[in-house]
Amino acid sequence: MALPKLNTPTYELEVPSTDEKIKYRPFLVKEEKILLMAMESKDNAQIIQAVKDIVKSCTFDKVDVSSMPMFDMEYIFLNIRAKSVGEVSKLKILCPDDKKTYADVDLDLTEVSVQVGDDHTNKIELTDDMGVIMTY
């Protein structure tokens, strides 16, 4: 007799750059271990790869993380983390005035959003006759 398969809850969010709705699930213990090992290595490439792998698996392989803007991936990861570990993250913020004092701050991850200015454009002028158009 096979063991029953446990289902994890699924949630939905809107990707900031495309307004596309995607489904996601909280990360599991194995994915949290991958993230913790990457963080312990202090290697940025490993951390980014771990986040990409977690976003890909927690969105049921429906998101192409290799071509996605980094701000979208970070937004999706924050939502996954909020549902997995807790919606409030405790931070210690260095006082910008004296650069010595730390303040404890609770950050509600569900209230984090991508901010786009009114004058934002996907075109970046490099010179008068050369530029780059971002694909997001």
Give the residues covered by each predicted segment:
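Short, surface-exposed, charged amphipathic helix/loop patches that serve as local interaction elements
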Residues: 1-136
